[in-house]
Amino acid sequence: MRPSKRQFDEMRAISFERGVSKHAEGSCLVKFGDTHVLCTASLEEKVPGWMRNSGKGWVTAEYGMLPRSTGERMRREASAGKQGGRTLEIQRLIGRSLRAVVDLQALGEQQITVDCDVIQADGGTRTASITGGWVALYDCLRWMEARQMASVSKVLKDHVAAISCGIHDGQPVIDLDYLEDSAAGTDANFVMTGKGGIVEIQGTAEGEPFSEDQFAELMGLAKKGIQRLVSLQQMAVA
């Protein structure tokens, strides 16, 4: 039995609350169980210098954890004067994942920054950030469309969502919380589109290497999980 008492293929309760920020063009509070992430999408009518006069736009992301999002207070990275390697890795992953389903040419020379701030962490913060980040991005594009600045259907090519899977006590399981993740022999994150395209897979064996058959089981769980997340995204933005 999993520490969370869930079945091996059972995800945590997942919800999206849209429009939670008064100022951001798009926003979403996403909850994967006790992991809560505030995602905001902000529009700037400019692009990075290296993209000027290209006719293309840009989508990027930033990620951070509030000091008391964890069991003990963490020091703010700003007070340390630099971002940690984990933070940089995660925010680059979020940006890559969102750009995978965006037509940058259709966006035009405008930049959307998706900020993902972890309010409460209980495992899977990067997967929640990607999944909720898509909803915030969608709402930002809706805001732009209402002002004839972009077309949602032309810019946003598909859904994108992410889920974690791992091997806990020899059993492949989906959507690990912190206790499960810290004890898992194998941990993997899957990022996929609504059509089933693979954007990124991150997988690591913490102890014993995992087999090809075990990976196939994790992949099967992830595909079903992504389908569920995409359905929830569709209902959230309907």
UniProtKB/Swiss-Prot annotation:
GO molecular function, a single term: tRNA nucleotidyltransferase activity
Catalyzed reactions: tRNA(n+1) + phosphate = tRNA(n) + a ribonucleoside 5'-diphosphate
Binding site for phosphate: 86, 124-126
Enzyme class, spelled out: transferase
Coiled-coil stretches noted in the UniProt entry, renumbered to this chain: none
A GO biological-process term: tRNA processing
InterPro entries found in the cross-reference section: ExoRNase_PH_dom1, ExoRNase_PH_dom2, ExoRNase_PH_dom2_sf, PNPase/RNase_PH_dom_sf, Ribosomal_Su5_D2-typ_SF, RNase_PH, RNase_PH_bac-type, RNase_PH_CS
Keyword terms: Nucleotidyltransferase, RNA-binding, rRNA processing, Transferase, tRNA processing, tRNA-binding
EC number: 2.7.7.56
Assembly behavior: Homohexameric ring arranged as a trimer of dimers.
Annotated family: Belongs to the RNase PH family.
Function: Phosphorolytic 3'-5' exoribonuclease that plays an important role in tRNA 3'-end maturation. Removes nucleotide residues following the 3'-CCA terminus of tRNAs; can also add nucleotides to the ends of RNA molecules by using nucleoside diphosphates as substrates, but this may not be physiologically important. Probably plays a role in initiation of 16S rRNA degradation (leading to ribosome degradation) during starvation.
NCBIfam families: RNasePH
Name of the featured protein: Ribonuclease PH
Species for this entry: Mesorhizobium japonicum (strain LMG 29417 / CECT 9101 / MAFF 303099) (Mesorhizobium loti (strain MAFF 303099))
